[in-house]
Amino acid sequence: MSNPLEFPWLSVLVLLPLLAAFGIPLIPQSRWVRWYALAVGAFDLGLMAYVFARHYDLQDFSLQLAERYAWVPQIGFHWSLAVDGLSLPLVLLSGLITTLSIVAAWNLSHKPRLFFFLLLLMYGAQVGVFLAQDMLLFFLMWEIELVPVYLLISIWGGPKRQYAATKFILYTAAASIFILVGSLAMAFYGEGFSLEMAELSAKSYPLALELLAYAALLIAFGVKLPIFPLHTWLPDAHSEASAPISMILAGVLLKMGGYGLIRMNVGMLSEAHVYFAPVLAVLGVVNIIYGALAAFGQNHLKRRLAYSSIAHMGFVLIGISAFTELGINGAVLQMISHGLIAAVLFFLTGITYERTHTLALDKLGGLAKQMPKAFALFTAGSLASLALPGMSGFVGELTVFLGLTTSDAYAPTFKAGIALLAAVGIILTPIYLLSMLRQVFYGAQDPGLVLEDYLGDVRPREMAVALCLLLPILGIGFYPRLATQTYDVTTVAVAAQLRSVLATEIVQRPFFPSPVQSAQVAALPLED
């Protein structure tokens, strides 16, 4: 073990929920299971906060609290964990949203043992994905996470849950193959076989191999993010999943795709990123505009929010492609912000369904009078999603825009085109979100709508969950350093690495021009 503190903090964070899940069958009464799951989730979240507050140096961009144990040495497989500024905020986000999803599922009566067992398994696997430093361990955690999600949708989902769950597992399992392909392509190249991310990153690959590995990983992470046209599993999964699972799907699972792109495609395959970055920028714009336009056509509340998530993830792609500190910083901030915003909106959607038993927008209406607290919370979440100043959504999107427009890696016309098209998507966002609010809460109530009066407005438990998500949204909006201080040192290092590689590529590989290289070459002084 390389951790100088001589205590495996990160292993505890990963293994605690995984092992605790197997204690659920031993609980004598079903009503105690939710308390047990909540205790495990809250303790793990509290332990994260303690470990990172006491033992993590925010000014150090390198990997910290590293642990490395030989697991299957015959194939070079190690239990290797570490944390840096990129993984730290996403680990905390995973802990917060999963713990709150346990509270959101408090009244679950159908197979609670199995539900919370799967939820804790998924929790541990998510944390493992963000902390893994061995590609095979990363792949293992990635795969462990898929099975609980499939079962949570197929057992506790809506009428078309089997279709949605099958589509999810087919898309994501097929995409996982590309993680394995890309990892093995890098591991087998050169002298010695290694799956350690640090060693793979230190290798120098032929351009063709690096481009191939980058493309494979882009497909894998593009399904999870998701990137158009690999997105079609997401609206179906959200529309059929229960609210607590939708909170995790949008709040954490999509971020695994963005994390993988930055950690591996950008961090480990920087030379290939020079060639793919313009493609990511274009795909980001497609995500933004397509997601916004598709959201307009949805009559189902959760499907509209699902397409909204696709649009918001487009900003992550643009930030990753910018080659600037602000761009990478904005991409990470957008992931954190969207995780909080999407989680609260899907949670409030679940409350709406619990009261009305429908999510069809043409059957809803006039709920503001009966549910004023829900209306206020839903309005706050929607305003955050449309990037109202003073909320985290505004800071994330603004930082991405600044990162793109201040980049000198692209020709001015290319930057202007990307920025203009992304701005069109921003204009469309308030239209479909405010229209959604109007359809749900304003106007006359549908005569056929039966409101469960005995449930009333938002209850204290539900209010607590919503506020635990909205307060960080407001806090980051007014003081972005609450989030950015956890990772800005790391994003500076990533951007510096990209700039160095970009300059080298222009000199050494002028054949294979890209918009990035063309802009840089045009800016070079001409020789006499």
Swiss-Prot record:
Q: Which InterPro entries match?
A: NADH_Q_OxRdtase_chain4, NADH_Q_OxRdtase_chainM/4, NADH_UbQ_OxRdtase, ND/Mrp_TM
An annotated GO cellular component:
plasma membrane-derived thylakoid membrane
Q: Give the highest taxon in the source lineage.
A: Bacteria
| Top-level EC class as recorded in UniProt | translocase
- Spans traversing the lipid bilayer: 7-27, 32-52, 86-106, 114-134, 136-156, 168-188, 208-228, 242-262, 276-296, 310-330, 331-351, 375-395, 417-437, 463-483
Note the topology in the membrane.
Multi-pass membrane protein
Keywords attached to this Swiss-Prot or TrEMBL record, sorted alphabetically, are: Membrane, NAD, NADP, Plastoquinone, Quinone, Thylakoid, Translocase, Transmembrane, Transmembrane helix
* Compartment(s): Cellular thylakoid membrane
GO molecular function term, any single one: NADH dehydrogenase (ubiquinone) activity
Catalytic reaction list: a plastoquinone + NADH + (n+1) H(+)(in) = a plastoquinol + NAD(+) + n H(+)(out); a plastoquinone + NADPH + (n+1) H(+)(in) = a plastoquinol + NADP(+) + n H(+)(out)
Give the UniProt record's GO annotations in the biological process aspect: ATP synthesis coupled electron transport; electron transport coupled proton transport
Q: What is its EC number?
A: 7.1.1.-
Family note: Belongs to the complex I subunit 4 family.
Provide the function of this protein. Answer: NDH-1 shuttles electrons from NAD(P)H, via FMN and iron-sulfur (Fe-S) centers, to quinones in the respiratory chain. The immediate electron acceptor for the enzyme in this species is believed to be plastoquinone. Couples the redox reaction to proton translocation (for every two electrons transferred, four hydrogen ions are translocated across the cytoplasmic membrane), and thus conserves the redox energy in a proton gradient.
Q: Which PANTHER family match?
A: NAD(P)H-QUINONE OXIDOREDUCTASE CHAIN 4, CHLOROPLASTIC, NADH-UBIQUINONE OXIDOREDUCTASE CHAIN 4
Protein name, as recorded: NAD(P)H-quinone oxidoreductase chain 4 1
The gene name on file is ndhD1
